[in-house]
Amino acid sequence: MKTFSAKGNEVKRDWFVVDASEKVLGRLATEIARRLRGKHKAEYTPHVDTGDYIIVTNAEKVIVTGRKFKNKMYHHHTGFPGGIKSASFEKLQDKNPTKIIELAVKGMLPKNPLGREMYRKLKVYAGSEHPHTAQQPKQLEIEE
């Protein structure tokens, strides 16, 4: 019996919509990353992007446990000397709530060209509306 290897152009990709309201950030991000990679499919192949498209709505209502709401820090560098910038979870959620889920999922994907291709299939929206109704996304329930 030969080992099956999926071809990139033969993979069937579905669209799923996830409601992030009252979901724990890490548990939500791991399931999203798993589905973006395609690990939930029988035809998963490590060197081929077999994942689905994921639309995340209500990103502003995602929660974190413990004291992370005040203590969790996000850092980035501007590229200039002394240009390290920091923001707490609380401030980032007020300023750009979609960035929180994007950063959490991006950190769980491979750091290579294939990982960037997987990341492009993630669509995050702060509110409950999204412009992807033409793709007829299926509702995806993620347990707590």
Curated annotation (Swiss-Prot):
CDD domains: Ribosomal_L13. Keywords: Ribonucleoprotein, Ribosomal protein. It holds the Pfam family Ribosomal_L13. GO terms for cellular component: cytosolic large ribosomal subunit. It comes from the Bacteria. GO terms for molecular function: mRNA binding; structural constituent of ribosome. Belongs to the universal ribosomal protein uL13 family. Part of the 50S ribosomal subunit. This is Large ribosomal subunit protein uL13. It comes from Legionella pneumophila subsp. pneumophila (strain Philadelphia 1 / ATCC 33152 / DSM 7513). The gene is rplM.
